[in-house]
Swiss-Prot record:
Monomer and homodimer. Part of the essential Sec protein translocation apparatus which comprises SecA, SecYEG and auxiliary proteins SecDF-YajC and YidC. ATP binds at Q114, G132, E133, G134, K135, T136, D539. It comes from the Bacteria. Its EC number is 7.4.2.8. The keyword Nucleotide-binding applies. It comes from Ruegeria pomeroyi (strain ATCC 700808 / DSM 15171 / DSS-3). This is Protein translocase subunit SecA 2. GO terms for biological process: intracellular protein transmembrane transport; protein import; protein targeting. The keyword Cytoplasm applies. Part of the Sec protein translocase complex. Interacts with the SecYEG preprotein conducting channel. Has a central role in coupling the hydrolysis of ATP to the transfer of proteins into and across the cell membrane, serving both as a receptor for the preprotein-SecB complex and as an ATP-driven molecular motor driving the stepwise translocation of polypeptide chains across the membrane. GO terms for cellular component: cytoplasm; plasma membrane.
Amino acid sequence: MSDTFPGQAPGAFYPRAPAEPAKSKLDRWIEKYTTLPRRRRRARPSRFFAWRVLRRGKAFAQMSDDRLQGEVRAAAYGMRAARAHPGEALLVRSFALIRECAGRELGQRHYATQILGARAVLNGAVAEMQTGEGKTLAITLAAGTAALAGRRVHVITANDYLAGRDADTMRGLYARLGLTCAAVEPGCTPEERRAAFAADIVYASGKEVAFTFLRDRVAMGGRAGDIGLRTRAFFDGTGLLLPGLQFAIVDEIDSVMIDEARTPLILSVPPADAEVEAEAARAAHAIAAELKEGRDYRLDRLRHAVELSRNGCDRLADLAERMPPAWRPAPIREDAVRTAISAIRLHQRDEHYILRDGKVEIVDEFTGRIMPDRSWSAGLHQAVEAKEGVEITSRRVTLAQITFQRFFRRYIHLGGMTGTATEAADEFWSVYDLPVVRIPTHKRSRRRTWKTQVSTRAATKWARVAKRAKALSASGRPVLIGTRTVAASEAASAALHALGVPHRVLSAAQDADEAAVVAEAGRAGAVTVATNMAGRGTDIILDAEARKAGGLHVIMTEKHSSRRIDRQLAGRAGRQGDPGSTEAILSAEDSLLPEFGGRYSSFVTRFGGSAVLSALTDAQRRAERTHVAARRRLLELDEQMAENLAFTGTPE
């Protein structure tokens, strides 16, 4: 019998899954094919289960609140007594109770498709529920059931805004179940963080949970076993911030565990020689500004890398006196200048970062949101600050690091939901042992896809976008214009201003009124320009007039580096059976072509039309392959590092 709620022995002080050994390519290949039957078996949803939940719920609907509370307490007792094997009948009872409590508290009862999605999560799978199908509500079935069974549940969201919003929305429902709910907010004190993680159900972004885990690792040192943890809790009287990794449900799981998994999570502190570091960053920037591409260095935009030529190395040797003494040796000065060139040529303001209050703030390329208190590693952040002429912060010393892949595999039970999992199904299985389950839609989609338009010039594209938005807005339809960067949002806004189209902008540079902008985006005739901030977890509610006029129209102005992100943007329209439409208006000057288009991209763009569209599609696929390879390389390096350090003691 498989475990619905697997767990370690009841006496385990810090429950978590054991670290897995690194796998060779041969091991991965063998595992891929020998485990295929198990993958298919776990990916088989049971429609009969949903029917039983709906049927059982009819009896609960007739009960008073007091009697329903008694049923909840009895269900919790039965679930905890069953330990890891609650059985189908107990799960049906729990789902039906949570569904009825949701109806009374939120005015919403789960559909059969939401029940199927939550059941797949309990099976340890990724439930692919189309955008607009109510994943946030569906998660409460799995989270509430696991918490009633005595498991500490972490609901991982794509960003901090969604964590706070969802926790506030669902707190009343969990209270009806006798469960506590909290959200972990960035910048909270250790005491507030510890209190939040003590709740039965915790909503937090993946980065917040992972960095809390790293802080605990640093605090516990080599005492990672139960005895060491108990000893620490006894003597310092505080214990750890994060009481184990038992049960995780990841909302928008492809964003959290695929897109964000290309860079490791690093916990660091400032160094002692900060002033010398700043001097070196300024000197490296000045030298890099004098070097020329082609003669002194070569850019590899595909790998985001810089390679110095022989001439560049010789020229750098002549200029080494400008560097502080400790940075003059060839390997160190060359690395510093390569980083400075990367800051100048490969990292652009209002695309990769913004300047706010004299500080460089990184923009998450997948969510479009600012990542406060985050910095690039290996001196890149200081190089960008030198380029922008702002105060240079100190390069930080690494205390601990881990990849998202290795972190999430430490959860005893892992599952999640997203609207776009199919493209990453193989990676979910090979890295996380998670099959993908496709859940049918509750209502037939009424979203229409219009023909893609392609221009040779970006200026022509923005003029077309503004013209389309003006016409649709005049007809009473709300319009959402999706952009990749802050700079692109400003270009779209300028084109709309030129035609006198009233609109609002939502981007990393203008995020203060996010909730208000989203709330108004579904009004009849509203025009909204947004980066990926409006691409995930955003439900644009249509008013009656907008619905009658034809619903929301989404305009994608650039292909992203992943088809999944494009699908998420398109999914803002036509949700829950609403009318809607989507189209792409692109250009040969879109940033995907120079980054991933290959050597013939500039030649192809001369022909325009279908040739440019084919080149953009090929560039997108190349970007996806590059990112898959980068994530695999990162995981292999992380596993190898963990193995090499294992002789010093248990690394966690």
